[in-house]
Amino acid sequence: MAGRAPGDHASGHSDAALPMSIEIRNESGVSVDEPALAALARHVLDEMRIHPLAELSVLLVDGPTIADLHQRWMGEEGPTDVLAFPMDELRPPPPGSDRTDRVGYTSGDPGPATVLGDVVLCPEVATEQAREAQRPVTDELEMLCTHGILHLLGFDHAEPREHATMFGLQDQLLDSWRTERGPISDAVERDESG
């Protein structure tokens, strides 16, 4: 999985019941259940106790586009599965703290609204990785989206301790998502109209 890099932000709109702004833009040519992906992102942000007015953009792109971004921002050749471009710098809590400390506030005080940034996913790479891992593509996309959001929240996996923390949290978030909400649609097909 790719790391974090600075980047642009695009805001979106969500329904009035859940004011969190999560925009999903699919420019990949691959059909993805975008409302379900937005619901997953909302679940992750809710579980991480992110301010309900936070803004997040998820962009789905094709292989050449993510390869270009990967080279430009990470200095690495070839396509990757996920990139995260944070806007407001957030840092993970110190070891041993609970989730109420995630972004510097305590229970009952949601803290300031923030622009989290952009998560860029490549369904083509996700499909290939899912095939290699012998798991559903939807599971791979869920994992990559969650992974990218955690990068936006300041988590990284360069060091063994960071890796254990980030991937442990990622697994917990995905388990709670699948238990409470169910997986996103298994329909990931090439969009022939575009």
Task: Give the ranges of each region predicted by the language model.
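An acidic/histidine-cluster motif and surrounding catalytic segment
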Residues: M1-L141, L150-G194
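Residues within the DNA-recognition helix of helix-turn-helix
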Residues: L144
